[in-house]
Each structure stands twice: as C-alpha cells, then as structure tokens.
UniProtKB/Swiss-Prot annotation:
Domain of life, per lineage: Bacteria
Gene3D superfamilies: Survival protein SurE-like phosphatase/nucleotidase
Catalyzed reactions per annotation: a ribonucleoside 5'-phosphate + H2O = a ribonucleoside + phosphate
UniProt cross-references to NCBIfam families, sorted A to Z: PRK00346.1-3, PRK00346.1-4, surE
Protein name (Swiss-Prot/TrEMBL): 5'-nucleotidase SurE
Main enzyme class: hydrolase
Family: Belongs to the SurE nucleotidase family.
Function: Nucleotidase that shows phosphatase activity on nucleoside 5'-monophosphates.
Amino acid sequence: MRILVSNDDGVHAEGIRALSDALRACGEVTVVAPDRNRSGASHSLTLEVPLRVSRISENGYYAVKGTPTDCVHLAVNELVRPEPDMVVAGINHGANLGDDVIYSGTVAAATEGRHLGFPSLAISLVGRTHFATAAHYAAQLVRGVMVHPLPADQILNVNVPDLPLDQVKGIKVTRLGNRHRAESVICTEDPRGQPIYWIGPPGSQQDAGEGTDFAAIEQGYVSITPLTIDMTAYSSLAGLGAWLDLQG
C-alpha cells in the first residue's frame, strides 16, 4: 500500500508528522504538503504562477509553494511514482465539522485525491493536544479501507475528539451539522493608518442535534461523515424542471 499524505496546516505541522509516522505501519508513505499554513484554502488550484517544490532533508517531505489541492494534484500527476494507492489528509489542527468542510483545505486535499481516482480520508483533531489519538484512528481506518474499499464517489471526513485514546467512547457515523452565519469581521489599521480586516472566528453551532458530527464530538465519539464528490442535488431535478416551466 502506497499512501500519499497531505494537509493544509503546512509541511512542518505536528499533525502531519503524527499521521505520517502512524501510517508507516500500513504501507509506504510519501508526504507532499504546503510549505506554510494554508488553512481555509478550500479547493483552490494555482494556475497563474508556477509551483515550486523543495525537499526537506531531515524527513524527505516535499514542500510545495501552493495550496493543498496543488499538493495532491502535483503529487499524483508528477512527484509520486509509482502512483499512490490512497490519499490521507491531516491531521488537521482543529475541527472540520458542519459547514467547515466548504472552506477546509484538508477536506479539499482528500476530495482532490478522490477526484483523481483514489480512496481518500480527511482526518481532523478537534483541538491541538492528542494527535496520537487521531493518528490511531487514521491508521485503523486506512487498514479498513485496504480490506473493504470505499465507494468510488465518496470520501470520509473524520473528526476525532481531543482526548486520550482510552477516553474516546467509540465511533459514530454522522451527518454534517451546521453553524450560524459568521458575522465577525475585525477592522483595525496598519502602521500607516490604512484600514485592514481580519475575518473573525466561525459562527456558533446551529444544527448540532443527535446524529450530527457536532453531537458525536460533544459526546466523546469519533465522527465519520461520508461526503460525496458529485454535488448534484438529485432530489431537486424534477422540481427545478417544473419551476422552469412556470417561467414560461
């Protein structure tokens, strides 16, 4: 098993080291990740400037001056030979719950892997302490995928509570919850008195009831949410056609 590992926190992040170390027991691991933190990059692809790649001497990781999606795309199509059998993104420093997934570079890296034809997982730790716990579950899931492959149009979005391994209650299969709209934008000034803006923290939980990823984490469980690559709203196709007919 050849495993490509990437993330959005950057090639020097603690989470990607913990993940790659744990997955070496499952197969041959190659790390291709952004050269710096690219959290919130979503599925952006660099098209207008060239991508530069360097190799970190002490661990052999590839550092790409680009986005998480760039990293997976470049790795699969150029850097990693033979091609990987699987893509694992993470361990993210913080949650990717609910509508976090539309912004997450970690989820995007896994999505790019699936788009390119490989089974893919996105692993996030809901905190910044117990990376070993998240790495344990990542390795467990990778071994599971080796035996029972995932459906061709899905990735698994995995969130792990920031707890010691023996305090995690188990695993729950969940749906995405939802946050309130984030309205906080912080305005300040640069040293020259010009206005600058910071996008504030994410909104509070809105849909976090039983069955959601939020609820599973709150209860001390690992949350696993299957995400589909095909974003077509099939249930709306007939209704949309009828709506168009009403327009004359």
